[in-house]
């Protein structure tokens, strides 16, 4: 169903699982598996390999890989389009 996965670190997982409305930023991404285009639905996987949820990509996989791990970049998944399990 979901061709692509975005893997996130512990800190990103904790923030996403908090009560705050927060977008998935590139700084919290550790790996990207598969390719996706902007607006594709991607699965979000935590540091232990568990599915955290799904979201609509704000960019394509190439742009996400370039921004991965960096500060001050646009969200890869905006919180309005983030569905947590």
Model-derived segments and their meaning:
Residues 3-85:
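Beta-strand/loop-dominated core regions that host nucleotide or nucleotide-derived cofactor-binding catalytic loops
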């Amino acid at each position: 169903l979901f061709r692509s996965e975005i893997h996130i670190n512990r800190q990103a997982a904790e923030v996403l699982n908090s009560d705050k409305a927060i977008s998935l930023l590139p700084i919290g991404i550790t790996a990207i598996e598969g390719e996706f285009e902007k607006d594709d639905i991607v699965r979000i996987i935590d540091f232990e390999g568990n599915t955290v949820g799904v979201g609509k990509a704000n960019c394509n996989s190439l742009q996400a890989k370039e921004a991965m791990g960096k500060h001050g970049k646009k969200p890869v998944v905006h919180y309005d389009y983030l569905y947590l399990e």
